[in-house]
Amino acid sequence: MSNARAFRLWSKAELQVPKTRKRKRVAASRPRPQSPTGPNQVWAYDFVFDACANKQTLKCLTVIDEWTREALCIEVASSIRANRVIDVLARLVSLRGAPKHLRSDNGPEFVSLAVLGWLEREGIETAFIAPGKPWQNGTTESFNGKFRDECLSLEWYRSRDEAKVIIE
């Protein structure tokens, strides 16, 4: 039975019809940058989630240089909001210089006005992938899969502090 027919029958039976949700749009529509031709041109960042033995959540922010495939930073915490993302990026920019592009998905931490404003002030262009298409950020997704398989799945961390020490 199609959704339209189900909604029509619910309405006829005077049942409450669920409201349809609008899809979130991409914050900025910039073309996807070409593959980098050297180091420090395109960075990509994303989150990986896991849990400790004591049921504390781990949220890992991974930042990768797409040319060298080097993990520039893995930040581990229970919660990483936009201000923490800015702090991590500012630390990396001061150490390595600013990239031309920063590729990410459309997570709330990445499309927040604070992060977008900071990137604009630093002269870094954003490159958001299309919603629901993680293969457009293949370098990061590949790294995150290997990070999960080789680090997170092999270790059973007793606490968040132990995970920070081992991962970072």
For each of these PLM feature ranges, what is it?
Residues 1-168:
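Charged DNA-binding/catalytic regions of mobile-element recombinases
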